[in-house]
Amino acid sequence: MERGKVFIVSAPSGAGKSTLVKGLIQLVSNLVFSVSYTTRQPRGQELTGREYHFVDRMVFEKMIEEDKFVEYAKVFDHYYGTARVSLEDVVEKGKDILLDIDTAGAAQVRKKLPDVVSIFIMPPSYEVLRKRLELRKQDNPETIQKRLQWAAEKEIYQYENYDYVIINDDFSQAMESMRSIVLAERCRKGRMTHRIQSIIKTFGGT
C-alpha cells in the first residue's frame, strides 16, 4: 500500500481557509482532516475532537517537552500544534491528511516532511480581508487590527514558500481549485507505483 500524502493549507486569518477545508473534506474521499491541539477556548459551536483538541497550557507544554508534535506555534497568545502520532496513523493507512496550520507551523512540517504539498489561500485584497474579519464577529476591533497587521507584515508574503496559491475571491472556484490540486497530486506516478505494476503484470510484464 502506498503511503498517504500530507497536504498543508495556510492563510491569513479571515481568508476563508477553514470553510474551504471543511468543504474539501466533504467533497474528496480518503482525505482526513488533521485535528490540531490548541490552548484557545472553543468558538461558537466548536467541539473538542472535531475542530480542535482543546487543552490547557500545562498539557500542551508537556506535549512539547515529550516531542509529541510534528509542528507547533504560538499565535496571538495561544498554542496550536499537530500531533505526530495522529499524522503517521493516517498516512500509514494510505489515506491523505489535510493540515490547517499557520505559516510558521507549515515551515516546520516542510523541514521534517519534505514531500508535503502546500497550498496558500490568499484574500483578494486587504480591504476584503478586513470586512470578512468584521463580519464573522469573533474578535473585538483591537484584535481585528492585530490580525490585519500580522497578515500585512508577516503572512501575506509567505505565499512564495508554497506549492500552490489560491485567491479566494469566489468560493466555488476556490473550492474547485483545491479539489483539482488534491486529485492531480494523487495521479503522480510515484503515488501509483503498486497499482501501475499490477496493471503491467496483466500485459505479461514484470
Where are these regions (language model features)?
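Conserved phosphate-donor/acceptor-positioning beta-strand/loop module used by diverse small-molecule
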Residues: 97-102, 111-136, 167-168
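Extreme N-terminal, non-catalytic leader segments
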Residues: 1-6, 29
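ATP-binding Walker
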Residues: 15
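P-loop (Walker A) phosphate-binding loop of NTP-binding proteins
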Residues: 10-12
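ATP-dependent small-molecule kinase phosphotransfer cores
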Residues: 38-97, 104-107
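Small-molecule kinase domains that catalyze NTP-dependent phosphoryl transfer to phosphate-bearing small molecules
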Residues: 138-206
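Post-Walker A helix-loop "phosphate-sensing" segment adjacent to the P-loop in P-loop NTPases
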Residues: 25-34
